[in-house]
Amino acid sequence: MRTDELDYELPQELIAQRPAEPRDASRLMVVDVPSRGISHHVFRELPRFLGPGDVLVLNETKVIPARLFASRPGGGEVELLFLGERGGAWEALARPSRRLRPGMPLSAGEGERLEVVEELGEGRWLVRGRDVPGLLERAGRMPLPPYIEPTPEAEASYQTVYARTPGSAAAPTAGFHFTGRVLRGVEEAGARIARVVLHVGLGTFAPVREERLEDHRMHREYYAVPEETARAVEEAERVVAVGTTVVRTLESWARSGVREGESELFIYPGYEWRAVDALITNFHLPRSTLLALVMSFAGRELVREAYEVAVRERYRFYSFGDAMLLLGGGRSLR
């Protein structure tokens, strides 16, 4: 598949800068994959599309305030975006990074010391500190995507209502639409709710730069499927994934049989689905692995048609934008 098949035209004003208020007032496009039918709803109506035999799977990862500003010796500021712990040190994306050197001390927060350990390439460095998680809680900022204006309101909104397990550098944005009211409605409709963890890295939002989609190398992300969730999924008549991170978690487990580990699974058209029957997701960036996953789930032409309808109907796009519910795709098409 050529990467330019993931391109589409999007007016700048359709990129959402803040979530709907309340969150479940966002719009919901429902796409029935077998019939190719498209209908328009509000997200709080989601429970009417679910029922007994369904399992709705959430990613309960929590975004950490991973963006930190530090000072070099002699002055000069560097922005560090912490991506995860590696053997007693932390991998961080540094901007600017050309003046960093192994062994260089950095000062952050209230004079707390960090040390540059090793260059990893592509602007990434290993950094060591006495209590990096504590430092981030005290002095870190939320790592908003570059297309969202960094306001206090945006930072406060960049978390799902059910986030529990810290570890992500980016949010599982399909979950932004959920409220306590919607979750209660799902259970009242007879569906079960199950939870997994996948800690989202920045590679999730990285554009595909290779000409051939198959040549793209996927990032690794930690995932875990609790035993209770595994049983619920195995017993379900229909598995409804909330977001592409849940898809990658469940499909990684289904392929490997491993409930906890790291996944670099890249899902694009031609993938053989094993675990997911319905998908709730946002409207994604062009040339993204996320859009490739959605096309694999529902078919390229139908997804292109749905995106054209979304632009025409003025849906809101990207992290704080509206949602789509894809029914009868993925494993259901086998």
Swiss-Prot record:
Pathway: tRNA modification; tRNA-queuosine biosynthesis. The gene is queA. GO terms for biological process: queuosine biosynthetic process; tRNA wobble guanine modification. GO terms for molecular function: S-adenosylmethionine:tRNA ribosyltransferase-isomerase activity. InterPro entries: QueA (IPR003699), QueA_dom1 (IPR042118), QueA_dom2 (IPR042119), QueA_sf (IPR036100). PANTHER family: S-ADENOSYLMETHIONINE:TRNA RIBOSYLTRANSFERASE-ISOMERASE. It is an enzyme of class 2 (transferase). GO terms for cellular component: cytoplasm. This is S-adenosylmethionine:tRNA ribosyltransferase-isomerase. It catalyses: 7-aminomethyl-7-carbaguanosine(34) in tRNA + S-adenosyl-L-methionine = epoxyqueuosine(34) in tRNA + adenine + L-methionine + 2 H(+). Belongs to the QueA family. Its EC number is 2.4.99.17. Monomer. The keyword Nucleotidyltransferase does not apply. It comes from Rubrobacter xylanophilus (strain DSM 9941 / JCM 11954 / NBRC 16129 / PRD-1). Transfers and isomerizes the ribose moiety from AdoMet to the 7-aminomethyl group of 7-deazaguanine (preQ1-tRNA) to give epoxyqueuosine (oQ-tRNA). It is found in: Cytoplasm. Keywords: Cytoplasm, Queuosine biosynthesis, S-adenosyl-L-methionine, Transferase. The lineage of its organism: Bacteria, Bacillati, Actinomycetota, Rubrobacteria, Rubrobacterales.
